[in-house]
Amino acid sequence: MSSVVYKRVVLKISGEALAGDKEFGIDFNVVNRIADEIKEVRDLGVQIGLVVGGGNIWRGRDAVGMDRTTADHMGMLATVINALALQDALEQRGVPTRVQTAIEMRAIAEPYIRRRAIRHLEKGRVVIFAAGTGNPFFSTDTAASLRAAEIDAEVILLAKKVDGVYDKDPLKHKDAVKFKELSYLDVLNKGLGVMDSTATSLCMDNKIPIIVFDLTTYGNIKKVVMGNDIGTIVKEG
């Protein structure tokens, strides 16, 4: 069996990624492709925790005039919808999967319990962490950093629609320069938008590297866990 570099990872997938080419909702072609990739990686013996966003269903910044806490709670519920879609796709492929939510909703998912999550991972189950941190004013990127620290993940795999971190938006600027490696302070000081400052600081404090890579290219998740040099790595300087 091919060797992997990372044995326990947190994979962060944005809600927008699940929308595919749509502006809204879930593209099940994308969900099924992601599930295929996760199965391949899980079959290599990698323990996978998933954190999913909700921006394909609800974006708090569009909630003009709405109470921020209420808007954030709606966003948390959106992540649960996405988590259930991913769980279903994975289970159809024979991958045992558990959804754990930061807000209790026992009829459809387990509550987040750290020791139980780790036990699931050790048994080869994929664990999807939904509902963010369970608190308003915190992003799902921060949830990914928090869960990675709690379950002792070796790396956060930050799945994007671009193949790494650039000095400016490569979709808008043809002369954008890609970074191969960055420090946490580079990300914070240059405002590169890899993750928000809270999420980045949490990774820095706990020395959790972040690998930013292109999710739209099939096979990239496997390449990253096997140590292939793709994307941008953010780590201690």
Swiss-Prot record:
Primary localisation category: cytoplasm
Catalytic activity: UMP + ATP = UDP + ADP
InterPro entries: AceGlu_kinase-like_sf, Asp/Glu/Uridylate_kinase, Uridylate_kinase, Uridylate_kinase_bac
Signal peptide stretch: none
Pathway where it operates: Pyrimidine metabolism; CTP biosynthesis via de novo pathway; UDP from UMP (UMPK route): step 1/1
Enzyme Commission identifier(s): 2.7.4.22
Subunit comment: Homohexamer.
Protein name, UniProt field: Uridylate kinase
Organism: Caldanaerobacter subterraneus subsp. tengcongensis (strain DSM 15242 / JCM 11007 / NBRC 100824 / MB4)
Designated gene of the protein: pyrH
